[in-house]
């Protein structure tokens, strides 16, 4: 692929698709064939066409390839890959645990884990030690999701936990779609680590059954069990609730930690490069949260909803998610389907075809987001609600330099009924962590120093150190992660 001569060799496939579209001016929809590594796919690179795929009135189910990819980690019953009636029942079972009202009750626990994170940052500052932010942020977000979902404090920031270690090993062994998945040792290790996770969660479930729910707070598991017990006979969950719970609790540990940790890491990187944006964030925190940073944890504990009153911080998060979205949605054409691109002839996609909603490509299209590779949180300020032609409502913005994103162009958590179930939790969690760290610490992105120490990584990437003008370009590591985990120095502010 010619794009590989223009970009780092380890650039994430979704970012490669964006470069491919730019190089060859491929338009709103194009075909990509990497057989035998992956099925032939149709990449959607236009908001209107993406809406056609994600809308409720003409559902495009999740493609079976998702199950093939995630099965070693999430089993066969994950809400991420389920379709039709089974998906609806799973969604209704777990969605209440991700409601804003319930998540507000969990904010004090998020504060508690973030305080441990701050202690570790202080240690790195004292030692003036170079470290990679993403792995450390991932342990923070895994600890938070462990409490929210299971009621278990993994304490992985300060010790090794059996489930977390198995989980991290398993992530490294997931298929990558870029090499043939035929190594028997890899398959054995996947089963080994998956069994470790399954047995761990079963012990938690059985302990709850024997001793009752946690008296201090209700977890997502508690809410799901309560709802399951109210279901009538004939439920679709013929696999048995325990296995269903195991598969989906693993799913939430996987999906619930990743977006938050990568987004936090990318925000620290971007704010290090854009002090003018950081100054605006700090000004907002001073105004809304007060200037006594020593009291911030207790303030958020006492008033959890105050974390929702940070519009500029939220704009920074949204712009970061635009630049670095999670991998796009993989759907399957339920029948022969005709798409009508704006600037190309109609395309008929055969039944069963793989359709990839190219979120990265849409987010980096200058037609929808002028200067798409630049960081401008103002794109997402001054929100208002409009009613679309089909009756849906959507929050839109005044935009940056007068350019507001069109409807359906911004989709970091996807859109429609299959929108990420944990999107609200991710936004709350990220705001909590930023509120507790940005005024206490100064973060310095340190890619140049990291490359000096690790020239082998530069060589492996073909000697290229940037994509889209950015050192923290996305690479494939089970999901879309920032290059080298965002190497950083951190300093304690006086």
From Swiss-Prot:
Pathway: Secondary metabolite biosynthesis. Its EC number is 1.-.-.-. Gene3D superfamilies: Cytochrome P450. It comes from the Eukaryota. InterPro entries: Cyt_P450, Cyt_P450_E_grp-IV, Cyt_P450_sf, Cytochrome_P450_monoxygenase. Heme binds at residue 420. Keywords: Heme, Iron, Metal-binding, Monooxygenase, Oxidoreductase. SUPFAM superfamilies: Cytochrome P450 (SSF48264). Its cofactor is heme. One of its GO terms (molecular function) is iron ion binding. Signal peptide: none annotated. Disruption phenotype: Abolishes the production of acurin A. CDD domains: CYP59-like (cd11051). Pfam families: p450. Induction: Expression is positively regulated by the acurin A cluster-specific transcription regulator acrR. Belongs to the cytochrome P450 family. Cytochrome P450 monooxygenase; part of the cluster that mediates the biosynthesis of acurin A, a highly reduced polyketide coupled to a serine via a peptide bond. The activities of the highly reducing polyketide synthase acrA and the nonribosomal peptide synthetase acrB are collectively responsible for the synthesis of the acurin A core structure with a heptaketide backbone produced by acrA covalently fused to a L-serine by acrB. After the formation of the PK-NRP hybrid product, it is detached from acrB by reductive release to set up the formation of the lactam ring by aldol condensation. This is Cytochrome P450 monooxygenase acrF. It comes from Aspergillus aculeatus (strain ATCC 16872 / CBS 172.66 / WB 5094). The gene is acrF.
């Amino acid at each position: 692929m010619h794009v590989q001569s223009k970009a780092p060799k380890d650039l994430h496939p979704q970012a490669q698709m964006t470069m491919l579209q730019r190089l060859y001016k491929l338009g709103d929809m194009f075909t990509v064939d990497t057989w035998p590594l992956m099925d032939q796919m149709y990449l959607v690179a236009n908001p209107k066409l993406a809406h056609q795929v994600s809308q409720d009135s003409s559902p495009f189910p999740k493609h079976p390839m998702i199950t093939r990819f995630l099965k070693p980690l999430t089993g066969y019953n994950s809400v991420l890959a389920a379709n039709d009636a089974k998906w609806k029942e799973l969604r209704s079972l777990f969605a209440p645990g991700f409601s804003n009202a319930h998540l507000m009750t969990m904010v004090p626990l998020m504060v508690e884990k973030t305080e441990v994170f701050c202690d570790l940052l202080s240690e790195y500052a004292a030692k003036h030690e170079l470290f990679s932010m993403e792995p450390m942020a991932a342990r923070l977000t895994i600890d938070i999701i462990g409490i929210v979902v299971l009621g278990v404090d993994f304490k992985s920031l300060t010790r090794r936990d059996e489930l977390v270690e198995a989980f991290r090993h398993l992530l490294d062994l997931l298929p990558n779609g870029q090499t043939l998945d035929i190594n028997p040792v890899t398959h054995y290790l996947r089963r080994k680590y998956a069994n470790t996770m399954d047995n761990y969660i079963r012990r938690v479930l059985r302990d709850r059954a024997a001793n009752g729910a946690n008296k201090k707070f209700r977890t997502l598991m508690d809410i799901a069990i309560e709802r399951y017990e109210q279901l009538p006979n004939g439920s679709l969950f013929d696999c048995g609730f325990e296995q269903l719970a195991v598969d989906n609790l693993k799913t939430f540990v996987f999906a619930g930690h990743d977006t938050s940790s990568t987004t936090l890491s990318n925000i620290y990187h971007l704010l290090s490069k854009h002090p003018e944006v950081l100054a605006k964030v700090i000004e907002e925190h001073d105004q809304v949260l007060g200037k006594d940073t020593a009291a911030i944890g207790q303030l958020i504990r006492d008033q959890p909803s105050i974390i929702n009153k940070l519009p500029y911080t939220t704009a920074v998060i949204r712009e970061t998610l635009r630049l670095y979205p999670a991998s796009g949605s993989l759907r399957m054409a339920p029948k022969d389907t005709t798409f009508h691109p704006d600037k190309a002839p109609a395309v008929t996609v055969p039944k069963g075809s793989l359709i990839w909603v190219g979120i990265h490509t849409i987010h980096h299209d200058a037609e929808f987001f002028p200067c798409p590779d630049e960081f401008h949180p103002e794109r997402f300020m001054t929100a208002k609600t409009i009613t679309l032609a089909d009756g849906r409502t959507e929050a839109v913005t005044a935009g940056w330099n007068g350019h507001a994103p069109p409807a359906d162009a911004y989709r970091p958590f996807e859109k429609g009924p299959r929108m990420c179930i944990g999107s609200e939790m991710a936004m709350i969690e990220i705001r909590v962590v930023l509120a507790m760290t940005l005024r206490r610490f100064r973060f310095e992105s340190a890619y140049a120093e990291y490359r000096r120490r690790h020239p082998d990584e530069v060589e492996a990437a073909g000697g290229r150190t940037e994509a889209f003008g950015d050192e923290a370009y996305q690479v494939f590591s089970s999901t879309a992660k920032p290059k080298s985990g965002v190497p950083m120095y951190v300093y304690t502010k006086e």
